[in-house]
């Protein structure tokens, strides 16, 4: 698995120890360049640890030891500082718009490789690999109904989604 490093200034100290969750997002943008620009813009005050393009290219934007700013107002298992306990992965995808868009095979393969690697290094349970929609229901809808949760379940990487 090949990763390209970019540096987002939007991060801080983890407050709760090492990560024990993975949060999957979609960018809601047309291109990886547009998403990378936003995720690395200090004025935007948002970031993620990883950005995966439709061709499977993985960009690392924030070191895993740092707290990326991707979860916003959210909650999981009674904890509200999800950014401090998670690794955020953004998938380049237009999102809902007029219709949800599929996630290409190369992108899903790269995501599976990345999740497998992160889970092994941080001992993250499948129940804690979730979507943004799971930690911020009613506020967020990503990665949405076209995301292949069933594939992640079959591989033992996730148990989601939580929401219908």
Can you name each region flagged by the protein language model?
Residues 17, 84, 124:
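Structured loop/turn residues at beta-strand edges in well-structured enzyme cores
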Residues 80, 94-164:
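Basic/polar, cationic surfaces and motifs that engage anionic cell-wall
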Residues 51, 88-90, 130:
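Conserved beta-strand segments that form the floor/walls of ligand-binding pockets within enzyme
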Residues 26, 91, 133:
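Residues immediately flanking
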Residues 24, 89, 111:
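Conserved, mostly hydrophobic/aromatic
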Residues 21, 86-88, 128:
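Structural preference for beta-strand elements that scaffold enzyme active sites
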Residues 80-91:
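Short coil-to-beta-strand
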Residues 1-80:
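N-terminal catalytic cores of peptidoglycan-degrading enzymes
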């Amino acid at each position: 698995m090949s990763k390209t490093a970019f540096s987002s200034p939007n991060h801080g100290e983890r407050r709760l120890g090492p990560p024990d969750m993975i949060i999957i997002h979609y960018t809601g943008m047309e291109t990886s360049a547009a998403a990378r620009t936003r995720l690395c813009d200090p004025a935007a005050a948002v970031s993620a640890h990883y950005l995966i393009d439709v061709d499977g290219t993985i960009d690392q934007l924030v070191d895993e030891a740092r707290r990326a700013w991707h979860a916003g107002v959210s909650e999981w298992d009674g904890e509200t500082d999800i950014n401090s306990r998670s690794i955020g992965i953004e998938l380049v995808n237009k999102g809902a718009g007029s219709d949800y868009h599929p996630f290409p095979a190369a992108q899903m393969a790269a995501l599976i490789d990345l999740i497998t690697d992160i889970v092994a290094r941080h001992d993250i349970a499948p129940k804690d690999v979730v979507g943004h929609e799971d930690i911020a229901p009613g506020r967020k809808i990503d990665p949405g109904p076209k995301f292949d949760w069933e594939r992640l379940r079959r591989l033992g990487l996730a148990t989601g989604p939580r929401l219908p």
